[in-house]
Design a protein with these regions (language model features):
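C-terminal segment of classical bacterial N-terminal signal peptides
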Residues: 16-27
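C-terminal/domain-edge helix-coil "capping" segments
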Residues: 30-41, 122-292
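Start-of-domain marker
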Residues: 28-112
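Sec-dependent N-terminal signal peptides
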Residues: 7-16
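N-terminal secretory signal peptides that target proteins for export/translocation
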Residues: 1-7
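Aromatic/basic-lined ligand-recognition segments
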Residues: 108-127
Length: 292
């Protein structure tokens, strides 16, 4: 009897503490199990429907890359109409391109490749669906065309991120920046920046120091050609930003391994009042530092 009274007292105290925090006891239990890795833990068993856009160029790349390299779940290709008909079905995940508009933007600036789970609330929009991964791909208006070269790398990074998120909530919640290998992983490798990925305000002195450290800045086409070499010791930059960056927009800066397809760096940056975006002096200095 005394033991039962002690247990009952402890339970009452625990309930009181939870209630004082505005939480019901069952909410505490849910908080322990409903983490991202639990929510997407069924990903390997579900079919991922890859939603084709109707654009032959982008659809061809999507089909080729998914068919040749997607390995963490079964998949099939579908139309936008199929997505609309099945988005409420929790038996499916969906990979699709979608444009996003940030709060201070006048119009959507960037197009993302996202993987979401079907289910309740899907009729309210993609933002209400459970997200497994979202990756910036290109400008929403007048994209550069570089996305076709980088899409295989993006899909590879998304696959790796989803797989890691199923075992490590720190990565799942912290995002792609946490998943990336980090600038330290670039030591001993050649890093090549496309000139269009670099801030227009980058001081010449920083460029000179970068060059001395073995970091190159070349034309966009020259940088992108390195992707096809398969060079395991080469890393290439990619920046996704609106075609006309404005204050309140964002850009995304990335470094990919040309040969290993690894994501070495990922960072989201707000666009300043002057519309400038791209890799800045502090990032070049950090890259140079790991080479000393």
């Amino acid at each position: 009897m005394r033991t039962r009274r002690i247990v009952a007292t402890l339970a009452a105290l625990a309930t009181a503490v939870l209630m004082s925090m505005g939480l019901a006891p069952e909410a505490c239990a849910q908080a322990q199990i409903n983490t991202k890795k639990m929510k997407i833990g069924d990903f390997p068993e579900k079919i991922m429907k890859v939603v084709l856009t109707g654009n032959p160029m982008i659809d061809s790349v999507l089909q080729d890359e998914i068919s040749s390299g997607w390995r963490i779940s079964p998949y099939e290709f579908c139309t936008v109409e199929d997505f609309e008909a099945n988005k409420g079905n929790s038996e499916f995940y969906f990979m699709l391109l979608s444009k996003a508009q940030f709060k201070k933007e006048d119009a959507p600036g960037i197009e993302f490749l996202t993987v979401v789970k079907g289910g309740k609330g899907a009729d309210k929009g993609i933002d209400e669906m459970l997200e497994a991964c979202t990756f910036p791909v290109r400008a929403a208006q007048m994209p550069s065309g570089r996305e076709f070269d980088f899409l295989p790398y993006i899909i590879g990074a998304m696959q790796g991120y989803i797989q890691k998120s199923m075992t490590d909530d720190r990565v799942g919640y912290a995002g792609l920046g946490k998943y990336a290998a980090g600038l330290g992983g670039t030591a001993g490798k050649k890093v090549v920046f496309a000139s269009g990925d670099v801030s227009k305000n980058l001081p010449e002195t920083v460029k000179e120091k970068a060059l001395a450290a073995g970091i190159e800045i070349v034309d966009d086409d020259e940088a992108d050609e390195l992707l096809g070499t398969g060079d395991m010791n080469c890393i290439v930059s990619y920046t996704v930003a609106p075609s006309n960056p404005e204050f309140g927009s964002y850009c995304y800066k990335m470094l990919f391994g040309a040969g290993d397809h690894k994501l070495y760096y990922f960072r989201k940056q707000s666009v300043g009042r002057d519309g400038d975006c791209g890799f800045i002096a502090s990032e070049f200095n950090k890259l140079a530092a790991v080479r000393r």
